C-alpha cells in the first residue's frame, strides 16, 4: 500500500490532491447482508468474511431486478480493512504534506430514533463511533 501511495503522490501535479474513501464501524465487519431497495431492483451489500487477526475481509454485491432471479456475486471485493490513522500515517510516509479527514454529518432521527448520515462531509479530527460509517481522506501533495 505504501508503494501505491508513493506512486499516487509522484503522479500528482504540484498542489494536487489524492482522495480516498473508507468505511468502518462494528456493523461493517459483521457477516450480514444489507438490502437497499430502489425502484425496480434491489441492491445487496454482503460482508461474507472478516478475519479479526488480519483485518482481511471479503464483500460481495448482488442485484435483483423485479421479476428476475437474484444475480449473486456480481462484484467480489477482498481487501484489508484499514483504519483512518493507519492510512494517514502511510500517506505522510509516502510524501503527502498534509491529510484531512472528512466525517459525515447526521440527519435528524427517524420515528424509531435511528440516525443516518446526511451526505454532507466536514473536516474534523474527532468523531463519535457509529455502527457503520463512511469517511474520506484528502491528501495534499
Locations of the language-model features?
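A short glycine-rich, Lys/Arg-flanked "PGG" loop and its adjoining helix->strand segment in the class I
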Residues: 1-17
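C-terminal lobe and adjacent flexible extensions of AdoMet/dcAdoMet transferase-like proteins
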Residues: 81-141
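SAM-dependent methyltransferase
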Residues: 19-90
Amino acid at each position: 500500500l505504501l508503494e501505491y501511495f508513493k506512486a499516487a503522490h509522484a503522479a500528482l501535479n504540484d498542489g494536487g490532491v489524492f482522495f480516498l474513501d473508507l468505511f468502518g464501524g462494528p456493523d461493517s465487519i459483521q457477516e450480514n447482508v444489507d438490502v437497499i431497495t430502489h425502484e425496480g431492483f434491489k441492491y445487496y451489500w454482503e460482508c461474507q468474511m472478516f478475519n479479526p487477526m488480519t483485518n482481511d475481509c471479503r464483500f460481495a454485491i448482488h442485484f435483483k431486478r423485479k421479476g428476475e432471479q437474484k444475480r449473486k456475486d456480481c462484484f467480489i471485493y477482498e481487501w484489508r480493512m484499514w483504519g483512518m490513522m493507519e492510512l494517514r500515517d502511510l500517506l505522510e510516509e509516502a510524501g503527502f504534506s498534509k491529510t484531512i479527514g472528512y466525517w459525515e454529518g447526521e440527519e435528524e432521527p427517524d420515528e424509531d430514533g435511528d440516525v443516518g448520515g446526511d451526505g454532507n462531509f466536514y473536516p474534523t479530527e474527532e468523531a463519535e463511533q457509529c455502527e457503520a460509517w463512511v469517511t474520506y481522506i484528502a491528501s495534499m501533495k
